Amino acid sequence: MIVSPCCRIIRTCCVSNRGTFHSRLAALYPSYIKIPNNHARIFVTKSRKINRPSSSFIIDTKEARQRNSDSSTVSSDLDEILKDQTPSAQLRLVDAYRRGFQSSTDSGKSSNKMQMWRTIIIKTILFGVVSCFTIVFLKKTLVGTFPKFLDQNIGSFAENTDVSFSDVQGCDEVKKELVDVVEFLRNPEKFNQIGAKLPKGVLLVGPPGVGKTLLAKAVSGEAQVPFLYASGSSFDEVLVGLGASRIRQLFTTAKQNSPCLVFIDEIDSVGGNRTFSPHHPFANQTINQLLAEMDGFQSKEGIIVLGATNQAEVLDKALLRPGRFDVQIHVSPPTYEGRIALLNLYLKKVKTGSNIDIEKLAHGTVGYTGADIQNLVNQAAIAAALRNDPFVEMHHLWDARDRLIMGPAKRRPLDDQTNRVSAFHEAGHALVALLTADSIPLHKVTIIPRGEAGGLTSFLQEKDISFMTRAQLLAQLDVLMGGRVGEELVFGADKVTNGAADDFRKATILAQNMVKRFGFSSKIGPRVIPDTQDEQLGEATRDLIDKEVDQLLNDSLTRVRTLLSSQSKQHKLLAEALLHFETLTKDEVLAVLAGKMKPPKTQSVTSKSTTLLPQLGPSTSTEIPRMIVSLIIVHVVDFISFFCPFKDTLHTYTHTHKLLFS
């Protein structure tokens, strides 16, 4: 076929610099006059693939390169190349070119530009539509909200409270200190006439729940002045300068309502130590504004700032200097008398039975704050309502106390071996507490699981203890070791469980404090070693501390082994009673050890909430009259106890009988 050789020739000779065929072919086919340069290049490249050595029209590659380098030769040789071709061959040559390139455009650049401009226009339109919708949405939602967010008026919290000192119980010493503040607010002129300067600020320091906020409201109520409340966290915002702006608003409102009381709760959020980090150059604006405002108003204006915190150590020293917070008052958890007053206050708000022993409750709530006692009474009332009881009884309060300390009670496991281990473990704790002179008095012992514990042995302090002797601390160690030793003596060293893990943790902490903080080690001496300095100690000192701690723990284990080994019979008797009754008070424990309260010989692991008797019902016809007599006795005793209550033991006994036969 002649087309292929012609294509080979055109690759080297028939395409001029301008990318056009010469006049002869153009004259015959005027529609194919102009050949774009890019088409010519493609045509030439494609034609290289055709290699027909037998054709006489194929030109040597070296010669072709020479002709391509000479542009004049390329232009002048077309007629010579085509002059020997027949018209049909020339037509085939042109047709081959037409079919290869007519379907394409003259240049691909024009279509690429159109596509680019089309994409730009579409994206611009979409961006404009989304922007319009966003602007409309923000205009509708944030036009009224954002200015309010910026200009939040903290002074809008100003109010007159009706709380008085009679509503605050358990902190009489603090109230006496605050009476002076009330007098400052009531009659500031009396102090101004004599030349005395009123305090600008009073700082209330104490743990959470002791009543700092209630005391501040009581001061405002007693003085009959407006009460402006602000939380320290309300001054912290993302926007720079907003906290300082709110400080200015607060004191502007205070000056407009003077005389008044400004109360800033959790003041450590805004008044903490200033930072000098270059990463937070504006972090100190809020506290600096607070310091400036407290310097700015005069004591004659009748404005007193009360701050409350439980982290006084983190406050900036400039805030605590005289002239700002002049007075610091420490609010501690209530004492024994304070707890009695709080119990009387909150128990009056619920329906209570006749067997409430407030003094005993006060002994059992050592360390409780006012909020804790309020929660205790509320939980007891909830429990009574859930059981459809008409009154809050003493056992409701004790159950609420155990629930708050250890968590809700769980159903006892059915595994007898687990029950036996728990019984001998708790019996060991209780027996050591009874037989150790300096231990905290026993309150009750139970094998009902609560929280993560399989049982509980609780204690009641007869009085508030501010200081503890070495003998008392050693007694606490012995009581903690009683559980493990109780298991070991009965089941053997290889059969003990991990139930004493928490006891060992508490004992280790106590022994470390005795050595490192309390000075009860003769080898370490009277020195305090904080935990943060352990890495700074020498290796010999650390080893000595470890040896002293180990000595205290091992000596305690030895003492408890000796004690319980000599009381193995009493230990077993108490454990068997716990297996039957599940929960025993101190009086019941003493009765069991004295032989006055014996469990039945046939042990059955039952719940005290369902029975205190060896059998759940009559097994023979002879026991039916006995059950009827028991029912009559229960109702008679319950009727008498309503007017003249007996001891808690009798009340609990009759109550469980009533549950059995109801």
UniProtKB/Swiss-Prot annotation:
Enzyme kind, highest EC tier: hydrolase
Sample GO molecular function, one term: ATP hydrolysis activity
Residues at which Zn(2+) binds: H425, H429, D503
Active site: E426
EC number: 3.4.24.-
Functional note: Putative ATP-dependent protease.
Family indicated by similarity: In the N-terminal section; belongs to the AAA ATPase family. In the C-terminal section; belongs to the peptidase M41 family.
Any Pfam family hit: AAA_lid_3
Record-linked PROSITE patterns: AAA (PS00674)
SMART domains named among the record's database cross-references: AAA
Protein's UniProt keywords contain tRNA processing: no
Claim: ATP-binding is one of the keywords in the record: yes
Amino acids binding ATP: G206, P207, P208, G209, V210, G211, K212, T213
A GO BP annotation: mitochondrion organization
Cofactor binding summary note: Binds 1 zinc ion per subunit.
Keyword vocabulary terms for this entry: ATP-binding, Hydrolase, Metal-binding, Metalloprotease, Nucleotide-binding, Protease, Zinc
Name of the protein in question: ATP-dependent zinc metalloprotease YME1 homolog
Any one Gene Ontology cellular component term annotated for this protein: mitochondrial inner membrane
PANTHER family named in the record: ATP-DEPENDENT ZINC METALLOPROTEASE YME1L1, METALLOPROTEASE M41 FTSH
InterPro entries: AAA+_ATPase, AAA_lid_3, ATPase_AAA_core, ATPase_AAA_CS, P-loop_NTPase, Peptidase_M41, Peptidase_M41-like
Organism of derivation: Schistosoma mansoni
Cofactor(s) required, per the database record: Zn(2+)
